[in-house]
Amino acid sequence: GKKMSSRKGGVFRTIELIDEIANAIEAQFENSDHEQAQKLAISALIINDTKGDISKDVNLDIPTMTKMNGDTGVYIQYTAVRLRSLMQKLNEEGTSNFSNTTLQTQFISPLQKKILFEASLLPLKIKTSLELLKPHIITQYLLNLSGLLNRWYNDSPKAVDMKDEERKQNLLRLHSILIVFEKTLKLLHMPRVEKM
């Protein structure tokens, strides 16, 4: 990564750094337009700056920061786009109305239970982060939730293969989790990325 020392003149302006990260993203992802690359660059920088304890040095390693997997803002945005896409697919299958649906345990896998439990921890993570003045607690929470959600996404049957009640249950869980996920993105001031 790049070492920055103000005594040696190695300081970047934030906008220049975002542009450099955005250029790396555009080079890495063929379908990335400039606006999307800028949003991903901001996300990459936010996560890179907040994933570790603030008392430690921050390493600016652009190739690592822009990876599609791992502890990166790009990975988190990829997860958010996947969740919204799955939500849209489930809605297209005719399960958009779940106002009278209650969560049924027979449709919950152990991984889904773990995800729901993790999602329920957001208020505690915020409280702890504020009390200790450690923003990395929230970032690590979001990275962990992203990993669990991607595992769930990869292991889940396709929406078209689900029975109606199973689809409704998945939509209800997904809707709840997406609310938590997007609130956490906003908490970290990450811009919304619509497609990847």
Per-range role (PLM):
Residues 2-196:
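Non-catalytic interaction-recognition regions
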